[in-house]
């Protein structure tokens, strides 16, 4: 039987053989829980750049234990000023699960809200050349195509940026549909 002690993040990090703990982290019900132990609250209040960087790491499969430590420490230290290494491993795992789950919910919402079905003309023109530039394109659009303002945009709350991107998409969709109406009237 595996014996799991109530250790800290630092103690776990310093272990030579983490296999029993890794197994527990991957499969034990206790470690699969998602709790807002760090009182992060609504992740849409986090800076847009933080959310986007986390989304990028999740999408690319880079959200490992070290990166979880980085993000929780970055967010938590702003609130409490304490170092993540002193945290109990179980609290850290369930707290980072909460953060990742909430970021994944935002990713799913974005997929639904911002998905654009390209036209044949857009595909023929090479729309796919913009693949991989998604986050940068969002930042650039929010900065009004002024790349010197991108860092300022990254500091804005995610909720504000999401609302603006949603508004831009609605305006784009409206103009596209309106142009189609005008185009069909001109052909009649």
Residue ranges and their predicted role:
Residues 1-188:
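An amphipathic, hydrophobic-aromatic interaction surface with interspersed Lys/Arg
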């Amino acid at each position: 039987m595996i014996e799991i002690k109530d250790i800290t993040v630092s103690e776990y990090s310093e272990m030579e053989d983490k296999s029993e703990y890794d197994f527990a982290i991957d499969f034990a019900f206790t470690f699969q829980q998602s709790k807002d132990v760090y009182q992060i609250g609504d992740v849409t209040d986090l800076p847009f750049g933080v959310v986007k960087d986390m989304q990028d790491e999740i999408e690319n499969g880079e959200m490992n234990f070290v990166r979880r430590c980085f993000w929780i420490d970055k967010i938590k230290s702003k609130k409490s000023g304490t170092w993540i290494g002193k945290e109990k491993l179980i609290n850290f795992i369930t707290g980072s699960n909460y953060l990742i789950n909430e970021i994944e919910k935002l990713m799913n919402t974005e997929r639904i809200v911002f998905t654009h079905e390209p036209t044949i003309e857009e595909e023929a023109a090479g729309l796919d050349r913009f693949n991989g530039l998604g986050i940068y394109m969002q930042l650039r659009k929010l900065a009004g195509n002024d790349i010197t303002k991108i860092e300022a945009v990254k500091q804005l709350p995610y909720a504000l940026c999401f609302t603006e991107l949603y508004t831009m998409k609605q305006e784009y969709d409206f103009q596209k549909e309106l142009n189609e109406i005008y185009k069909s009237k001109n052909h009649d």
